[in-house]
């Protein structure tokens, strides 16, 4: 009897203890920790809204963003009030380094160039934030830390060296020729016509990355990237919801579809990778695509360490990097291209200057790698497009342990956000024409335009700078050169200016342009 009572009271004690521990953790998570971090940030002179239970600023930010996007904006490149209105408001109210509440986590917004440079250069002391929902979309180099990141960066670097890009240039050309032919087929007998170029440019960049990621497995690669595009749309539609506690455990139709896509993509990539591995083991020549170069680099790493497979990437690692090829290779380049065409439509003098240079170098011949590197006007235009419409609107890092930036002490548990677009549109940093299209500012290069300050980083910066930026810029130069050779273009009266922040800044209502064939 006494033994039974002892067991009974023991169970009650354990249950009560576990209940108290769980209650404490929940209380700390939803209230005590956020309020403690808020107090510490305010002591550093940083200000923002007071913490609100669980959701923080999410609800207000969502409502303001929805209102800002409720109708097209005027034809202007001052897009910040439309794409990040809430962050803009916080900076206006609270000064240069305010904080915003991403649910229960305070996110410190840094807008001072020296602090931003410090953050981006301290890779080993800061982490990439881990949002569960993004696991559906990508893994690989972008989320790795420490030694694993260093190893993957080293192995992938072989695929993005300039001599490798030179080999890939003809496949860029093939994809561009296909797109130009499709555009020509839509023109009327007088050589003019209206099209929405946005879907075409998305297909172009998807085509390019499919050819250059998977080579002979191009068709299967294209199907995978179509699935990735659908997954990206689902992720962004549910991003705010995913920050609500326990959201991922709710069995919705969207959740089921995201899991289905993830499973399909992973199994398809495994099939392609295993097929390529078998071909390489059989002595077949390595294909000069990103997958082939990555696998060859991986095999070399294993051989250099006495055939120790633990020193290379696992199959799961390679799958993750292949997913990343899409995100890096498709999203950023397609948006760069669409905004380039929109801006050149609005500024015909720059369109003509770029066309004259392209025709001077190539005439009616197809662009090649050597000729693209001789262009001066077009790179200036692309740099300015990336300044006004950067692929990523900001960079986020997680503070895992207390750290100091300049004179500012930032406590562990805070996220640091670097708003690329705010810096690149800042009148104090770029002059009174900061929100206007003026490629002339890059006439003597990026360093001269920025006066050596860290105020321009469309592809990120520091050790984690995007390693695919040369791939993206080469593709953009090839595509725009061919478009200029073949078409004059201007905005259609039906064009609605609707910059929209999805994964990147995209034209929500498309990009309707009138094309006119250039006479041979």
UniProtKB/Swiss-Prot annotation:
Protein topology in the membrane: Single-pass membrane protein
GO biological process terms, semicolon-separated: saponin biosynthetic process
This protein's UniProt keywords: Heme, Iron, Membrane, Metal-binding, Monooxygenase, Oxidoreductase, Transmembrane, Transmembrane helix
Coiled coil spans: none
Residues holding heme: 466
Protein name per its UniProtKB record: Cytochrome P450 716A67
KW Heme (keyword) present: yes
Transmembrane segments: 4-24
Record-stated family: Belongs to the cytochrome P450 family.
PROSITE patterns named among the record's database cross-references: CYTOCHROME_P450 (PS00086)
EC number: 1.14.13.-
GO CC annotations on file: membrane
Enzyme class: oxidoreductase
């Amino acid at each position: 009897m006494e033994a039974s009572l002892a067991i009974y009271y023991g169970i009650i004690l354990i249950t009560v203890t576990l209940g108290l521990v769980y209650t404490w953790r929940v209380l700390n998570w939803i209230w005590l920790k956020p309020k403690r971090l808020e107090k510490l940030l305010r002591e550093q002179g940083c200000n923002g809204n007071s913490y609100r239970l669980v959701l923080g600023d999410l609800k207000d930010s969502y409502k303001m963003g929805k209102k800002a996007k409720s109708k097209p904006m005027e034809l202007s490149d001052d897009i910040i009030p439309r794409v990040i209105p809430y962050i803009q408001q916080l900076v206006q109210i609270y000064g240069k380094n305010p904080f915003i509440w991403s649910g229960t986590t305070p996110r410190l917004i840094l807008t001072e160039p020296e602090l931003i440079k410090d953050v981006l250069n301290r890779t080993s002391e800061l982490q990439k934030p881990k949002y569960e929902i993004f696991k559906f979309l990508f893994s690989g180099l972008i989320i790795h830390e420490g030694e694993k990141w260093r190893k993957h960066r080293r192995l992938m670097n072989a695929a993005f060296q300039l001599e490798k890009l030179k080999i890939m240039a003809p496949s860029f050309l093939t994809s561009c020729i296909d797109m130009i032919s499709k555009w020509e087929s839509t023109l009327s007998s007088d050589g003019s016509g209206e099209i929405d170029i946005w879907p075409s440019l998305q297909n172009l960049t998807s085509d390019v990355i499919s050819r250059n990621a998977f080579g002979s497995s191009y068709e299967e690669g294209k199907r995978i990237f179509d699935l990735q595009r659908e997954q990206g749309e689902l992720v962004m539609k549910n991003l705010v919801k995913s920050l609500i506690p326990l959201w991922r455990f709710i069995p919705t139709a969207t959740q089921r579809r995201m899991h289905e896509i993830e499973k399909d993509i992973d199994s398809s990539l495994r099939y392609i990778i295993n097929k390529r591995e078998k071909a390489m083991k059989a002595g077949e020549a390595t294909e000069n695509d990103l997958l082939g170069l990555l696998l060859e680099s991986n095999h070399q790493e294993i051989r250099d360490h006495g055939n120790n497979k633990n020193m290379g990437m696992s199959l799961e690692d390679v799958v993750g990097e292949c997913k990343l090829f899409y995100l890096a290779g498709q999203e950023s380049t397609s948006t760069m291209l669409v905004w380039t065409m929109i801006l050149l439509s609005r500024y015909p003098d720059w369109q003509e200057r770029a066309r004259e240079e392209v025709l001077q170098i190539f005439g009616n011949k197809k662009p090649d790698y050597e000729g693209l590197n001789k262009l001066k006007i077009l790179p200036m235009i692309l740099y300015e497009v990336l300044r006004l419409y950067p692929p990523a609107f900001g960079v986020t890092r997680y503070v895992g342990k207390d750290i100091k930036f300049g004179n500012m002490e930032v406590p562990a548990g805070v996220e640091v956000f670097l708003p690329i677009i705010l810096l690149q549109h800042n009148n104090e940093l770029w002059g009174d024409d900061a929100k206007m299209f003026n490629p002339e500012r890059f006439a003597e290069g990026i360093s001269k335009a920025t006066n050596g300050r860290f105020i321009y980083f469309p592809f990120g910066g520091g050790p984690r700078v995007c390693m695919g930026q040369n791939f993206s810029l080469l593709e953009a130069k090839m595509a725009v050169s061919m478009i200029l050779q073949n078409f004059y273009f201007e905005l259609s009266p039906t064009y609605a200016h609707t910059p929209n922040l999805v994964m990147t800044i995209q034209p929500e209502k498309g990009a309707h342009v009138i094309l006119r064939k250039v006479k041979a």
